Amino acid sequence: MIIEIITIFPKFFDSFFEHSIIKRAIKKNKIIFQVHDLRNYSNNKHNQVDDSPYGGGAGMLLKFPPFYECLKKIKKSFSKVILLSPQGTLLNQKMAFEYVNEIKHLIILNGNYEGIDARILNYIDAEISIGDYILTGGEIATIVLIDVLVRLLPGVINSESYLEDSHQKDLLKYPQYTKPKIYQNQKVPEILLSGNHKNIKDWRYNQSLKNTFFKRPDILKKINLTEKQQKILLEIKKKLKEG
């Protein structure tokens, strides 16, 4: 997968590429990054890429021409161009999987200040948001998106690691424990020490559903619950009523 980033802060990504899973993916040639400094496409001696908005208003907007010129140079017929924006579709795990499986060349545009001249919208394929809040720039959101995508690339991490993640199966993850068995009088659930893999699997399944019920009930409203899941939820609700 090739990811190209258009930004006014190209050095923002330097340390990100040098750590953890991202660095490993680069070394394994699973991902190639290219970062483009928007100022190199300003076509003016001061490298200015922003200006005040027509019609008045606070702040500055990033200009349309630099983005257009950069896209003209790097975009391929098979590229997908996205803009990180609070107005975009909320990023989720399903979307991330689709991107990894379907996209070979991704171009990410980063807005700053009050955003980008709206004419850029005619040259993108999608707007993506990482949440209903405002950041100082798109670069942080880009890092989030890249991290989500890279860990799903085949061969970057063990597939079992992400197949058990929260949201991977429309539910939150079950609680996990490690050594010691007892600390501050808090014990690891006995079932996890039993060695009975079927019972452990069933316990984790139930706990995953329970976690989702208590922490993110909105998720359960969006999925078609199986008969087994409905039965487990009824038991949870029954125990709540009984105190």
Curated annotation (Swiss-Prot):
Major localization class: cytoplasm
A Pfam short name: tRNA_m1G_MT
Enzyme category, top tier: transferase
Catalysed transformations (reactions): guanosine(37) in tRNA + S-adenosyl-L-methionine = N(1)-methylguanosine(37) in tRNA + S-adenosyl-L-homocysteine + H(+)
Binding-site list for S-adenosyl-L-methionine: 111, 130-135
A GO term for molecular function: tRNA (guanine(37)-N1)-methyltransferase activity
Record's GO cellular component terms: cytosol
Cellular compartments annotated: Cytoplasm
EC number: 2.1.1.228
GO biological processes: tRNA N1-guanine methylation
Keywords of the record: Cytoplasm, Methyltransferase, S-adenosyl-L-methionine, Transferase, tRNA processing
InterPro entries from the UniProt entry: Alpha/beta_knot_MTases, tRNA_m1G_MeTrfase_C_sf, tRNA_m1G_MeTrfase_TrmD, tRNA_m1G_MTases_N, tRNA_MeTrfase_TRMD/TRM10
CDD domains from the UniProt entry: TrmD-like (cd18080)
Similarity field: Belongs to the RNA methyltransferase TrmD family.
Complex formation: Homodimer.
NCBIfam families found in the cross-reference section: PRK00026.1, trmD
Function: Specifically methylates guanosine-37 in various tRNAs.
Name listed for the protein in its UniProt record: tRNA (guanine-N(1)-)-methyltransferase
Species name: Phytoplasma mali (strain AT)
Lineage: Bacteria, Bacillati, Mycoplasmatota, Mollicutes, Acholeplasmatales
